[in-house]
Amino acid sequence: MGNCEGFNRRAFLGSVAVGVGSSAILTSNAQGQENKGQENASAKPEQTQQFVASYPILQNVTETSASIAWALNTPSTGWVEWGTTPALGKIARNSEFGLNPFEEDFLSARISGLAPNTKYYYRTATAAFSYRTAYDKSATEPQYSDVYSFTTCGPNAKSGSFFVMNDTHNTIPTIREHVKLADELKPDFILWNGDLCSFYMDAQHIKENIANPTNSPYAAERPIIFVPGNHDRRGSWARNLKKCLTTWEQDDPKFYSLGYNYAFRQGPIAAILLDTGEDKPDWHPAWSEMANYEPYRELQTAWLMKALERPEIKSAPYIVAFCHIPLYDKNPKANPGNILDRWASFQWPCCQMWSPLFEKYGVQLAVAAHQHRFSYAEPTKDRSWAQIVGGGPEMANACSIYCYADENEMKLTCTKLDDKSELGSWTYKPRV
């Protein structure tokens, strides 16, 4: 993926082409003993080829904010230019502790201060950057993406829709078929419900399978919502996944560590994002003392109670929860996730904590994955919420879930990916 095969460079860069002849040198003018004798020193970054490795990935669109990430081929700095018209005019940078970003593999920026149900425009800007010493550094001229647009979510939209793909396990042909179907259905957002890859040992793996699996701007205008799966926690690079799949901002410091938990309204639908964690208990020898999910799930339970009390969530006509590992399995012998034998078929510890809140606040549907086979469980007298489980990574068992809701009903449909046949369709009436 180093040169992003199939990447339309001319369309992506717009009017700026970067190469040896067009590299601009930016030299610090800082004074002091450290830079004595090198005030005018500068050096071009060694890589003057294309240094953007993916189209922008729009994510985490809320009523008032959105984040954008993009992959790199060389160490760079960058920012997002945005505005209410294609003229843009504002800049967002992922600055931290007074420093603007400098990254090797991914850049990102969060746009804030937005208005609900409003259209915005943006483009990314990337400049390859080189440090030789503290004051001997340089950057190329920015490389710009095309201008894209998105609309913030909010409760005032008359309808809401989402598309779910899951357990892709770095199977790029399957990912491309999912995206092709999503292009036809035009959902408000794509929810990638865990196990995007089988493991994460380096950044290149993420660039190929997540940032640019289709060689197209598949997520530049239609946001990706990421719900972690158990495989998304495996490997030496798993802790860096947030560089590409950005986390949500929590408004309560108590929940700052819950980066992938969030609740938002998309028209009549309230979406609740939960993280079931790994498919074995923390004390399983497979983790070598590297798992600590029990307190993490307990904290999510406290967060979930607060999220479901939020007025815009509590008043939603439909409430849908998303998590990777199912919370229910009809098989009485199914592995519940709290024993040493093999791996969880469903996550009974999470169900014990979260199902009572689903009951109390009227959650109608849980959308899950993990089992690599489609299933649908109707509500029962002991469980008022339904559960749908998506398919697996191979075309033979892959399926897509699509949901559309308006003021009259919410309709859920599951489709086989290989022949586009319908596996089932269900409707839900408004809660309120």
For the regions a language model picked out, list residue spans one by one.
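N-terminal secretory signal peptides and thylakoid transit peptides that target proteins
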Residues: M1-V20
